[in-house]
Amino acid sequence: MKSSELNQRRQQATPRGVGVMCNYFVEKAENATLWDIEGNEVIDFAAGIAVLNTGHRHPKVVAAVAEQLQAFTHTAYQIVPYESYVSLAERINDLAPIDGPAKTAFFTTGAEAVENAVKIARAYTGRPGLITFGGGFHGRTFMTMALTGKVAPYKIGFGPFPGSVYHGVYPNATHGVTTADALKSLERIFKADIAPDQVAAIILEPIQGEGGFNVAPADFMQALRDLCDTHGILLIADEVQTGFARTGKLFAMQHYEVKPDLMTMAKSLAGGFPLSGVVGRAEVMDAPAPGGLGGTYAGNPLAVAAAHAVLDVIAEEQLCQRAEQLGSHLQEVLNQARATCPAIVDVRGRGSMVAVEFNDPQTGEPSPEFTRLVQQKAQENGLLLLSCGVYGNVIRFLYPLTIPDAQFSKALDILARVLKS
């Protein structure tokens, strides 16, 4: 079957709202390689949108899921619990940068984790208000759309959204937004929109994902912690995209001398299986009444088995160090490309959470057109890239951290040629 034929069937069978980026269909995948139904080979620098830090079908993940498949596939943890859920919670509690005793609850999607973090924060504080940041992305449910600071394509035509959500400014040195500017935006919210004693939580991504891989400065993160402590506000770190070795640490918050009260996780937690979680201070996590948290598929045993294997692989294969090594090489290649590609305005990131931003050299304005061209040319040469950014003018790199050196070098050669051309 040809991809063109299958695309016609897709258009007839599925709604246009489920946007599809690639015009080919995958048949098989292994580590950092995809093969489409026509036999073409693609180097995967998207990894299912940051889900495959341990690669496609890592043997240890596959083996763990296969073993669980022979035991049981579903009971609903709230009905009949299982040890693997408890032991995974224990592992996350030990690993997460939470101050004091921690507890963890598992869910299915990143948006579901954020929704439950909001429920927990409101239950603990008895307050309604939430502060988040422009450019942030937190999910596609109604509450998480309200929290998200990017309209297209996520929020168009879906309002009105839940209230008591306020957006501050996220620091961005490339665009001249300082930590002081960001903090002033919060002061204005407290003066104009909601009193601080009515705010349950401030939620942010330590590195914005969809927003363009903008890295929160250390002084900003410390100021948020101090602000939260002053007013009895909880600090929630959304680590859905940043977690599990992507940034060179198991969690991005470990780059800071700051500990959140709650932290959300998903994506690479379970190596391609749907699993998310919220970890936080035990007293905060215990605020909802029994039955207040859960879900039919929350903490599915197959996904939990995969997550145990993922944590083992990250430790055994030293993927945090690997992320630093690969990311450093990538940033070097991108910075060298600036000499021949005047559209590059910034190269940024931490570990292997790296991005390059493009502007029109003539006008200085964001150039989503050039960004799409880079993606197109890369795809023609067998390299799959993702874009992001409020203006769609950023390429983000989300390759598996298990990618072989030779394949990584090949991908960077393709990237360098595309940028030069």
Which role does the model predict for each range below?
Residues 1-421:
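Conserved N-terminal phosphate-binding loop of PLP-dependent enzymes in the Aspartate aminotransferase
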